Amino acid sequence: MSVLSDKSIRKLAVEQSMISPFIDKQVRDGKISYGLSSFGYDARVGDEFKIFHNVNSSIVDPKEFSSDNFVTKKSSDYIIIPPNSFALGTTIEVFKIPRDIMCIVVGKSTYARTGIIVNVTPIESEFFGTVTLEFSNTTPLPAKIYANEGVAQFLFLKGDQSPETSYADRKGKYMGQTGVTLPKV
């Protein structure tokens, strides 16, 4: 596997709509950076979030998940994640991953250095949709996540050959997702 450079990412974004909307350069302007980087793409989080809250000391069960465990917040500026808590967001960008590509997502150092961990599971070949982002506030203090700014870097890896079965072939459960998507079994 090889990591795609800015040239390869740009070509796939323009010719195959791999990232839409696609920002062809790093944008800073007093914001947490987003857009094309040397070997990745810094995606932005949108303005809708779901923040965990404790309802009657419920237990989080991924097989029987209740949307009542979240409060939905919409903000064009930022949201606040309570201390030692968790939130979900979604990318502004829609991703259309080619068959011979997979994607690994890592959090931006700006957030990591303030105790905010961004997690996303690998994005498999031929996935299509927005990407749900998981945020953990590991600090004992409330923490801000800025809407419409960079939150995570997407690294695109080209396989040695196309897979026998892609995410689309398997009819992956998160295929075509838009907005913040809760767990599915």
Swiss-Prot record:
Pathway participation: Pyrimidine metabolism; dUMP biosynthesis; dUMP from dCTP (dUTP route): step 1/2
One Pfam family this sequence matches: DCD
Recorded coiled-coil stretches: none
Any one biological process term the GO annotation gives: dUMP biosynthetic process
CDD domains assigned to the protein according to its UniProt record, in alphabetical order: trimeric_dUTPase
EC number: 3.5.4.13
Keyword Nucleotide-binding: yes
Keyword Nucleotide-binding: yes
UniProt-annotated catalytic positions: 134
Gene Ontology MF term list: dCTP deaminase activity; nucleotide binding
Residue numbers binding dCTP: 108-113, 132-134, 153, 167, 177
Keywords attached to this entry: Hydrolase, Nucleotide metabolism, Nucleotide-binding
Catalytic activity: dCTP + H2O + H(+) = dUTP + NH4(+)
Record-linked Gene3D superfamilies: 2.70.40.10
Family: Belongs to the dCTP deaminase family.
Main function: Catalyzes the deamination of dCTP to dUTP.
Subunit structure: Homotrimer.
Name of this protein: dCTP deaminase
Organism: Pelagibacter ubique (strain HTCC1062)
